[in-house]
């Protein structure tokens, strides 16, 4: 899940309140 983890990190940095959990 490296790809998902990377996307999650990017989304988290861009939007801390991202709904991608």
From Swiss-Prot:
It comes from Escherichia coli (strain K12). This is Uncharacterized protein YnbG. Induction: In stationary phase (at protein level).
């Amino acid at each position: 899940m490296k790809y998902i983890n990377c996307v999650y990190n990017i989304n988290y940095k861009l939007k801390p309140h991202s709904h991608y959990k």
